[in-house]
Structure formats: structure tokens, C-alpha cells
């Protein structure tokens, strides 16, 4: 999913938090940056003024403006030209410093957004870098019900009619929490972290066949809903056409594997849906098993080791 942000969107989203004022280049509000590929040579999203390797948002603090003032007229004009020519998303001046007239005029002429904030330079840098990184991070929407079970994020997937929503409802009644139903959105906010959230349209809602749309917050209380959670496990529900006949190894280890989501392989456990099986209990057990495995505890491996030791002791 391609993501982008315009200068106007960034300004509106950060105006109150950073007390931003738009002082020049208002016609450049439609300037846009898009999520780029993982390229070490691409420009930084935000940073202090850099003419050689320009940032997408150039921050001018006390030292940067003092450096501009130290240049002679010709060097100053050439430097401002270089700043403008690379077409940054915006320029941001910290500490409510006055905007130099020539810089403001160049911003207006080139339609380069220029903002002023009372925040210090490093505060602007931290806020803008974090916000841009989150906004432009790779993201994907998956079909399923995303829940918090035993404090970890679990995505329940399966074909239509496999019982995902009914399972989610049972888990809610057992004290677990809903993040998103039907279309949770996952963002890769770090090399090994997928953050799952709910689209605004579906917030607090769970659709169950026969009951329609339920408001989980109203039915179970505020604590039954979670704003976001990191994805750690996928539980996939499958409906076998015939009685499954797992191999001996699968009987020991279960039907586990992984699913590739963005750049990560997420652990996956498959649970067959059959009459008489308590899927809520099985999903809780699968989650507990995953937690144990992350701690290096594998019951199947322990049993295999015990069995091997027993055979060795009994072998003459």
C-alpha cells in the first residue's frame, strides 16, 4: 500500500503539538513526499539544515541561521538557492526566531512552505521524524479479527464462515480484548515490529452472523477494546473436508509454520474447525504455547529428548 503526506497534512497534524505558524510559501501546501524503498542513499525525512544531503523537512535552528548570517551576500544567495532548488517538503525555524526576509521571499517565490515554531530544534526533529516515519511506513490490510490474548497480539484468520467472529466473541467473554474486526491495518514501524490498528470506520465494532454488528465497547466496557497491538501470532482456522489424519510428527508439534507479512515472517498455528472442538480454549492454549516457545520452552522437543534418552538407556 503506497502512502504519502502533503505539506498541508503534516502542518495540520502537528500544528497544535508544535505550535506551528505558516509564514511563507502557502501555495506549496500540496507538496508531497511518498514512502520510499529501503535505500540507504535516500534523503532523511527530517533533519537540521543540510545543503549537500538535504532532508525532506529542513530545520533551521539558532546555529543554522547564525551560519547563514556569517556568509557574504553572494554566498548567502547561493546557499538559499540550493536550499530551495531541492524542493523540500517544508522549512521549519525553531525557537520563534524571526524569518530572514530573503529566505521568506525565496520561499514565497518558489512556493516552499516555511514554518516557525517555539520548540527547540531537537524537539522539532524528534516529533517530525517520528511522525513522518510512522506515516510513511509500509502498511497492509489483512482479513481477520485482531485481538489481544494474554497480552500479545493475535490475528485470527480463516475462510468466510469459519467462525472467526464467534471465536472472537467467546474470547471477549473470557476477558480478552478486541483491536480490530474484518480489516485490521498493520504498519511496519521497525524492522521486526508490525503494529496493528483498527480503521476508524470499524472502531469498537464486531460483526457476528445472526446478530449483526455489535459494539464491543458498549457491551463489554472500555477495557474490552485495545487501540493497537504488535502482531506476534496468527491463528488460522481451517475446515477440513474429511477427518484429518496428521502424521506422528504433527501430532507432537502441531500444525505450525509462518506467514510472510510485509518483511516479516509471523508465527502461524492452524486449528481445524470441527464439531465439539472448543476453539476459544484451543486459541488460548496456542497463545500460551507460543509464549513458551519464545522463552525457549518447547514441550514437543522435551518429549522427543526424553523418548530418545529412554531408548538409549534400554538399548543393550
UniProtKB/Swiss-Prot annotation:
Catalytic activity: [HPr protein]-L-serine + ATP = [HPr protein]-O-phospho-L-serine + ADP + H(+); [HPr protein]-O-phospho-L-serine + phosphate + H(+) = [HPr protein]-L-serine + diphosphate
UniProt-annotated binding residues for ATP: 158-165
Residues engaged in binding Mg(2+): 165, 207
Keyword line: ATP-binding, Kinase, Magnesium, Metal-binding, Multifunctional enzyme, Nucleotide-binding, Serine/threonine-protein kinase, Transferase
Keyword Magnesium (UniProt): yes
GO biological process terms on file: regulation of carbohydrate metabolic process
Class of this enzyme: transferase
GO MF, one example: protein serine/threonine kinase activity
Family stated for the protein in its record: Belongs to the HPrK/P family.
Its job: Catalyzes the ATP- as well as the pyrophosphate-dependent phosphorylation of a specific serine residue in HPr, a phosphocarrier protein of the phosphoenolpyruvate-dependent sugar phosphotransferase system (PTS). HprK/P also catalyzes the pyrophosphate-producing, inorganic phosphate-dependent dephosphorylation (phosphorolysis) of seryl-phosphorylated HPr (P-Ser-HPr).
Protein name, per record: HPr kinase/phosphorylase
Organism: Xanthomonas oryzae pv. oryzae (strain KACC10331 / KXO85)
Upper taxonomic lineage: Bacteria, Pseudomonadati, Pseudomonadota, Gammaproteobacteria, Lysobacterales
Gene name tied to this protein: hprK
Amino acid at each position: 500500500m503506497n502512502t504519502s503526506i502533503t505539506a498541508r497534512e503534516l502542518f495540520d497534524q502537528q500544528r497544535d503539538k508544535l505550535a506551528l505558524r505558516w509564514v511563507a510559501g502557502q501555495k506549496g501546501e500540496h507538496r508531497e513526499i511518498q514512502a520510499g524503498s529501503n535505500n540507504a542513499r535516500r534523503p532523511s525525512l527530517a533533519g537540521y539544515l543540510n545543503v549537500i544531503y538535504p532532508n525532506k523537512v529542513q530545520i533551521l535552528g539558532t546555529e543554522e541561521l547564525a551560519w547563514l548570517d556569517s556568509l557574504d551576500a553572494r554566498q548567502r544567495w547561493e546557499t538559499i538557492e540550493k536550499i530551495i532548488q531541492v524542493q523540500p517538503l517544508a522549512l521549519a525555524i525553531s525557537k520563534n526566531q524571526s524569518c530572514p526576509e530573503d529566505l521568506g521571499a525565496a520561499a514565497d517565490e518558489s512556493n516552499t512552505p516555511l514554518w516557525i515554531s517555539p520548540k527547540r530544534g531537537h524537539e522539532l526533529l524528534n516529533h517530525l521524524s517520528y511522525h513522518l516515519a510512522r506515516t510513511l511506513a509500509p502498511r497492509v490490510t489483512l482479513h481477520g479479527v485482531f485481538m489481544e490474548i494474554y497480552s500479545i497480539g493475535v490475528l485470527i484468520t480463516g475462510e468466510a464462515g469459519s467462525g472467526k467472529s464467534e471465536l472472537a466473541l467467546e474470547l471477549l467473554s473470557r476477558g480478552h480484548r478486541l483491536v480490530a474486526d474484518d480489516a485490521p491495518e498493520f504498519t511496519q514501524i521497525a524492522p521486526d515490529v508490525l503494529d496493528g490498528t483498527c480503521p476508524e470506520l470499524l472502531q469498537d465494532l464486531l460483526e457476528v452472523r445472526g446478530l449483526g454488528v455489535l459494539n464491543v465497547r458498549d457491551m463489554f466496557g472500555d477495557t474490552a477494546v485495545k487501540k493497537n497491538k504488535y502482531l506476534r501470532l496468527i491463528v488460522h482456522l481451517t475446515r477440513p473436508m474429511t477427518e484429518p489424519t496428521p502424521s506422528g510428527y504433527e501430532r507432537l508439534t502441531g500444525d505450525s509454520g509462518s506467514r510472510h507479512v510485509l518483511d516479516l515472517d509471523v508465527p502461524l498455528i492452524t486449528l481445524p474447525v470441527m464439531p465439539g472442538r472448543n476453539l476459544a480454549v484451543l486459541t488460548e492454549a496456542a497463545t500460551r504455547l507460543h509464549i513458551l516457545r519464545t522463552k525457549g520452552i518447547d514441550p514437543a522437543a522435551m518429549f522427543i529428548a526424553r523418548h530418545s534418552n529412554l531408548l538409549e538407556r534400554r538399548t543393550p
